Regions:
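Signature of N-terminal electron-transfer/Fe-S-associated modules in redox systems
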Residues: 1-153
Length: 153
């Protein structure tokens, strides 16, 4: 089996096909930006994009991923050495405290902005509501998404 992750093809024939994508990314491929939070798909820390859709990688086995699927992790947001506008906004507004949820927050925010480049505050709240932040940085997260929308090309 092969996976297209961040526009690179990875051969995972030697990996148990029932293994969750999160652990393949982290343990087998060394892509450790995607975080483990709850292991049950509730918190959003493990969010990646599969064909542009935010997906909880802790609950999806690699066998459930279509052969032609494109997976993007937080490592795949930056292009040509330049931070993605969402990453830049999260840094500018000093969003992270503990950082546990940040990769998932950024992946959900990116998916929102790719679908709706000018979301309202309510749109942001709705899109981000299933991403939990232990530190309660929800106001700064919303501000960062608004800032990122202005930075998007």
């Amino acid at each position: 089996m092969q996976l297209n992750i961040n526009d690179e093809i990875y051969n995972i024939d030697q990996i148990d096909s029932n293994r969750k994508l999160l652990w393949v990314l982290r343990d087998e491929l060394g892509l450790i930006g995607t975080r483990y939070g709850c292991g049950a798909g509730f918190c959003g820390a493990c969010t990646v994009h599969i064909n542009g859709q935010p997906t909880r990688s802790c609950i999806i086995p690699v066998s459930a991923i279509a052969p032609d699927a494109r997976i993007r992790t937080v490592e795949g947001l930056a292009e040509n050495g330049n931070l993605h506008p969402v990453q830049q906004a999260f840094i500018e507004l000093q969003v992270p405290q503990c950082g546990c949820c940040m990769s998932g927050q950024m992946m959900s925010a990116t998916a929102l902005l790719e679908k709706d480049p000018n979301p309202s505050r309510e749109d942001i709240r709705s899109a981000m509501k299933s991403n939990y932040c232990r530190c309660g940085c929800y106001q700064r997260i919303a501000l960062a998404v608004e800032r990122a929308a202005k930075l998007m090309p």
